[in-house]
Curated annotation (Swiss-Prot):
SUPFAM superfamilies: beta and beta-prime subunits of DNA dependent RNA-polymerase (SSF64484). Belongs to the RNA polymerase beta chain family. InterPro entries: DNA-dir_RNA_pol_bsu_ext_1_sf, DNA-dir_RNA_pol_su2, DNA-dir_RNAP_su2_dom, DNA-dir_RNAP_su2_hyb_sf, RNA_pol_bsu_bac, RNA_pol_bsu_CS, RNA_pol_Rpb2_2, RNA_pol_Rpb2_2_sf. This is DNA-directed RNA polymerase subunit beta. NCBIfam families: PRK00405.1. Disulfide bonds: none annotated. It catalyses: RNA(n) + a ribonucleoside 5'-triphosphate = RNA(n+1) + diphosphate. Its main location: plastid. Keywords: Chloroplast, DNA-directed RNA polymerase, Nucleotidyltransferase, Plastid, Transcription, Transferase. PROSITE patterns: RNA_POL_BETA. One of its GO terms (biological process) is DNA-templated transcription. It comes from Arabis hirsuta (Hairy rock-cress). GO terms for molecular function: DNA binding; DNA-directed RNA polymerase activity; ribonucleoside binding.
Length: 1072
């Protein structure tokens, strides 16, 4: 949050700030912390010592640019160098060298890393904060059982529980529990120290039996008893150093390391003053926790809410990268130890450079970015998607929850989420409530807590002043917080006497004088996606959730358009996404073209490259269009070029189109949408999609594969687009089945397949004749388009043969068509059902045909009335040539503020354009419209307007699929499933019932045999169909039935069937 120099005013923080602040924290603090933990390494004879000098570490600037790293499939990383010393203790000599430890992937200003040419982002994780938590549960008798759970920094748990006899146990697993006296003794306390450090010594003495006294008589006895209980070991184990090490590794390291945050939380909860650098659980902690547990039993103290955000911590990108660095340095330590030992055994003189290898660090980070669940491929469908992806919060991942084990209470909205986690924006399906989104103003504090800003109100010198505070979830419970519906920042302005406020997770109505804090912004509670929905306060939250998800699926259109009705955040979203090109210096434009803009300033000439037809990982087209003219003087920060889905530096995901809410011959039944052919012919909803096809050359046992145009046994028609090297030419139009890259793979043919002249050459001259198999890259079904780019990448490797990858990029122009999905910004989504000629569409009183017809029944039941306000205000804005930016919850200005604004704008539009039908007082917002087929008016007036409608990535071209023949599963011999595998349509149990119900026996038999898994019958069908014969009936069982028989046999069940003769009742047994 940035103050702009005035009291009580502020600007919205950068939306990518949370990511690159975390990365900066890792570089500035985490890197030094982990390097300083690297131990001094000695050989077995203690003659040589290896150590790192952390103060001299250096990160080198990358040698390649981000764009080159993407094109060449490389990692945009920095090399880490550290000074290392090798000390010979006998001669006291030291050799110091600057060594290369490995590559650390860098993050750009947008919070994105590039690993192996792929844009990746690390999302933040919410974990249970380490510390102690008290809870109460009812047992089977209905009696409250109190427990205290100590959670370590690693996620390990140790439970303290008190039973009916007031005995305190430590539960180390679900079945094993041990007396707290034994645990404290095993951790180093004697009985006297225990009784001196507790508030209720008589309770501890009450369950001290003679057997218990023997167990805690000495530390060794206590450790042996604890080891037996913890490891479930029978017999009498003997106390030894190895036993202590095993216990240390299995129990104390996993369950007793609290970390910095855990130590702070336990000190605060148990009123202790143990130093912050003491990060392990102490006997004093255990005894204080037991005291609090006894207090809970007697009704003193408060239980903990596990779902409160004060009991959670955010594991940010800094923590994840620091953990990986620690893991890599531990591996490096083992490598150095092994190398020193090997050098001494072979009597070699080691040097610091010879001892260290860069492999552990480089491979650890590559595997982290490639395999870790919290490192995800950046979704680049549109600019909004890129920003929202980096602001996700996940309960899932290592150390977190899973979609199947998380209960409803964890998924639900909690009052502590206010201003920190968006109550609306979450995923749909099994992960609902487990993946959330940060609120706009939230930030991550020093202790891993989510902080939200508030204005503090206080009086000084009879003058009301305002100051901004960032509060963690544990702090804002103690303040009366006004809920943001009080308008003035200045106390001089008369306020309402009573205002709604929040206090200790309750909503109250209090006098204005009692308010301590107030919200700073109407958007403070929402994420970016939810903040882009106008009139969100008039929508049901479920529909707002759908809308915030669907905006991220909007496809950038070929001709973008600003929304007439917006919320005011569109500009910042576009700027922070990095999609528009922005001037970094002021100067004068020398020239502009589609590839670059040349700018002169401060005596220098700067060339700014523009993105041209770049493919995103969702196959959408990223493209920049210059917005400045030659000779124009520009200032720093001015927009030079608009990107995909931005116009004038504002987010533009869809189009403002004329819509009517009315039924039309059933074509908009169940959310279907009727559209005009104008949207197709006018390229209103046309988008470009770029697909990538690649092929790699390998070295086989018979020799290397070749890229060539000379492909035998293929029609010349398929090879028409290849150049002399065998690669498709730029700009050529390709159809399904065309060869994109010609490739031959060598193989040795059998003796019988040689031609006579080949056999003669082999017999006389001994020449080995090899044949080749064509393994060309062919364009799959649905891939037709224009070749816009070809890249031939040679991978750098240590082998003698470096594989080559050839990538072909093909652009498709897609108009809107039947089956495509469209949506508004209020969760109103639908599939195009029919494209009508413009003359048949309903038309307005001024003769304009509408572009789209929605079903009016989709509004009242879904309770998303915001679309009606947007629709009507959009119509007024288009007639008045105005754009509106409306903050949410405008009802705080006055009652019915939204309706008054819309009606007043419609009335003004009606007056200025001399069109009385725009605002008719009898039915405001509605109008009489006419049937385009007959010219007659419809019976009822209809709501018409101009809402902002998006075209989504779910397009029929990517989904439609058919199969004539293809691959079969090896076991069941049935067709595979799915479009990607060229699979078949499943005929399930209910489909069989439907066919049985209509008595179509032959069709049913075909479905279950020829078209499915009867191997011999389906082979015979082809031949008989070609010659025109009758299709033979299958005599034996299909393969899936045979599979069932085999599975029954594996369970020792034999299945047979018999034929009984009608004449003599002879039984003939037949094999199944």
């Amino acid at each position: 949050m940035l103050g702009d120099g005035k009291e009580g005013t502020s600007t919205i923080p950068g939306f990518n700030q949370i990511q690159f602040e975390g990365f900066y924290r890792f570089i500035d603090q985490g890197l030094i912390e982990e390097l300083s933990k690297f131990p001094k390494i000695e050989d077995i004879d203690h003659e040589i010592e290896f150590q790192l000098f952390v103060e001299t570490y250096q990160l080198v600037e990358p040698l390649i640019k981000e764009r080159d790293a993407v094109y060449e499939s490389l990692t945009y990383s920095s090399e880490l160098y550290v000074s290392a010393g090798l000390i010979w203790k006998t001669s006291r000599n030291m050799q110091e060298q600057r060594i290369f430890i490995g590559n650390i992937p860098l993050m750009n200003s947008l919070g994105i890393s590039i690993v192996n040419g792929i844009y990746r982002i690390v999302i933040n994780q919410i974990l249970q904060s380490p510390g102690i938590y008290y809870q109460s549960e009812l047992d089977h008798n209905g009696i409250s059982v109190y427990t205290g759970t100590i959670i370590s920094d690693w996620g390990g748990r140790l439970e303290l529980e008190i039973d009916k006899k007031a005995r305190i146990w430590a539960r180390v697993s679900r079945k094993q529990k041990i007396s707290i006296l034994v645990l404290s003794s095993a951790m180093g306390s004697n009985l006297r120290e225990i009784l001196e450090n507790v508030c209720y010594p008589e309770i501890f003495l009450s369950f001290l039996t003679d057997k218990e006294k023997k167990k805690i008589g000495s530390k060794e006895n206590a450790i042996l008893e604890f080891y037996q209980q913890f490891s479930c070991v029978g017999g009498d184990p003997i106390f030894s150093e190895s036993l202590c090490k095993e216990l240390q590794k299995k129990f104390f390291h996993q369950r007793c390391e609290l970390g910095r945050i855990g130590r702070r939380n336990i000190n605060w909860r148990l009123n202790l003053n143990i130093p912050q650098n003491n990060i392990f659980l102490l006997p004093r902690d255990i005894l204080a926790a037991a005291d609090h547990l006894i207090g809970m039993k007697f009704g003193m103290g408060t239980l903990d809410d596990m779902n409160h955000l004060k009991n959670k911590r955010i594991r940010s990108v800094a923590d994840l990268l620091q953990d990986q660095l620690g893991l890599a340095l531990a591996r490096l330590e083992n490598v150095v130890k092994g190398t020193i030992g090997g050098a001494i055994r072979h009597k070699l003189i080691p040097t610091p450079q010879n001892l260290v290898t860069s492999t552990p660090l480089t491979t650890t980070y590559e595997s982290f970015f490639g395999l870790h669940p919290l490192s995800q491929v950046l979704d680049r469908t549109n600019p909004l998607t890129q920003i929202v992806h980096g602001r996700k919060l996940s309960y899932l991942g290592p150390g977190g929850l899973t979609g199947r084990t998380a209960n409803f209470r964890i998924r639900d909205i909690h009052p502590s989420h206010y201003g920190r986690i968006c109550p609306i924006d979450t995923s749909e399906g099994i992960n609902v409530g487990l993946i959330g989104s940060l609120s706009i103003h939230a930030r991550i504090g020093d202790w891993g807590s989510l902080e939200s800003p508030f204005y503090e109100l206080f009086e000084k010198s009879k003058e009301a002043r305002i100051r901004m505070l960032f509060l963690s979830p544990s702090q804002d419970e103690y303040y009366m917080i006004a809920a943001g519906n009080s308008l003035a920042l200045n106390r001089d302005i008369q306020e309402e006497q009573a205002v709604p406020a929040r206090y200790r997770q309750e909503f109250l109505t209090i006098a204005w004088e009692e308010v301590n804090l107030r919200s700073i912004f109407p958007f403070q509670y929402f994420s970016i996606g939810a903040s882009l929905i106008p009139f969100i306060e008039h929508n049901d939250a479920n529909r707002a959730l759908m809308s915030s998800n669907m905006q991220r699926q909007a496809v950038p259109l070929s001709r973008s358009e600003k929304c007439i009705v917006g919320t005011g955040l569109e500009r910042q979203v576009a700027l922070d996404s990095g999609v528009p090109a922005i001037a970094e210096h002021e100067g004068k434009i020398l020239s502009t073209d589609t590839e670059k803009i040349i700018l002169s300033g401060d005596g220098n000439t700067i060339s700014i490259p523009l993105i041209m037809y770049q493919r995103s990982n969702k196959n959408t087209c990223m493209h920049q269009k210059p917005q400045v003219r030659r000779g124009k003087c520009i200032k720093k920060g001015q927009i030079l070029a608009d990107g995909a889905a931005t116009v004038g530096g504002e987010l533009a995901l869809g189009k403002n189109i004329l819509v009517a809410y009315m039924p039309w011959e059933g074509y908009n039944f169940e959310d279907a949408v009727l559209i005009s052919e104008c949207l197709v012919y006018g390229d209103i909803y046309t988008s470009f999609h770029i697909r990538k096809y690649e092929i790699q050359t390998h070295v086989t046992t018979q020799g290397p594969e070749r890229i060539t145009k000379e492909i035998p046994h293929l029609e010349g028609r398929l090879l028409r687009n290849l150049d002399k090297n065998g690669i498709v030419m730029l700009g050529s139009w390709v159809e399904t089945g065309d060869i994109l890259v010609g490739k031959l793979t060598p193989q040795v043919a059998k003796e019988s397949s040689y031609a006579p002249e080949d056999r003669l050459l082999r017999a006389i001259l001994g020449i080995q004749v090899s044949t080749s198999k064509e393994t060309c890259l062919k364009l799959p079904i649905g891939g037709r388009g224009r070749v816009i780019d070809v890249r031939w990448v040679q991978k750098k490797g240590g082998t003698s043969y470096n594989p080559e990858i050839i990538r072909v990029y093909i652009s498709q122009k897609r108009e809107i068509k039947v089956g495509d999905k469209v949506a508004g910004r209020h969760g109103n989504k639908g599939i195009i059902s029919k494209i009508l000629p413009r003359q048949d569409m309903p038309y307005l009183q001024d003769g304009r045909p509408v572009d789209m017809v929605f079903n009016p029944l989709g509004v009242p039941s879904r309770m998303n009335v915001g679309q009606i306000f947007e629709c009507s205000l959009g119509l007024a804005g288009s007639l008045l040539d105005r754009h509106y930016r409306i903050a949410p919850f405008d009802e705080r200005y006055e009652q019915e503020a939204s309706r008054k604004l819309v009606f007043s704008e419609l009335y003004e539009a009606s007056k200025q354009t001399a069109n009385p039908w725009v605002f008719e007082p009898e039915y405001p917002g509605k109008s009489r419209i006419f049937d385009g087929r007959t010219g007659d008016p419809f019976e009822q007036p209809v709501i018409i307007g101009k809402p902002y409608i998006l075209k989504l990535i779910h397009q029929v071209d990517d989904k439609i699929h058919g199969r004539s023949s293809g691959h079969y599963a090896l076991v069941t011999q049935q067709p595979l499933r799915g479009r990607s595998k060229q699979g078949g349509q499943r005929v399930g149990e209910m489909e069989v019932w439907a066919l049985e119900g209509f008595g179509v026996a032959h069709i049913l038999q075909e479905m279950l045999t020829y078209k499915s898994d009867h191997i011999r019958a389906r082979q015979e069908v082809l031949g008989t169909t070609i010659i025109g014969g009758t299709i033979p009936k299958p005599e034996d069982a299909p393969e899936s039935f045979r599979l069932l028989v085999r599975e029954l046999r594996s369970l020792a069940l034999e299945l047979n069937h018999f034929l009984v003769s009608e004449k003599n009742f002879q039984i003939n047994r037949k094999e199944v």
